[in-house]
Amino acid sequence: MKVKSWIGGIAISCAMALGAQASTGDHSNDPIVVAAVSPAELQRATHDATRQVQGKSRIWCVPFARLVSGVEIRGNANTWWSQAGSQYPRGHTPITGAVLNFRSSKAMPMGHVAVVSEVVDTRTIKVVQANWTRNRITVDAVIDVSPRNDWSQVRVDNGGSFGRVNPAYGFIYRPAETLASN
């Protein structure tokens, strides 16, 4: 069996997302195998996605995250979590290549999506994202400040200091089994 990539011939490795939950069936609490991406693979996907959005009058988080992660969801970021429920595993454990899905808030009425580029420790990650800083693609540290350590409240590094607390749903994963073919 060959593993196909989610973007541009990039090889994918597999990882267990301990916080992932299956969206259907009787085994909703069983761990599931999801696609993880090496830093080099993510860098290449980010480069490819950046080239595709360059020259556009505006860079948006949704198409950028879709291109980088391979998670094929459309619509505003605040709709991704509910849409993912029928298509993709979701959970509260960051892994490289997963989409961090921010909830709507007063500051972000349409929500936000970013792709995990590095897991630093259990409460710190780095994400690659578009339009956190207007019309730019950036790599930023994100810390989990939720009382239950479930990534439901996060702060994003803004030039050396972590900004406001942002509500988040969690992580949307690319399932490994969708990558396999004969």
What is each residue range found by the language model?
Residues W6, W60, W80-W81, W132, ...:
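A residue-identity detector for tryptophan
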Residues G9, P63, Q83-A84, N135, ...:
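Enriched - but not universal
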Residues D26, D121-N182:
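Aromatic- and glycine-rich peptidoglycan recognition patches
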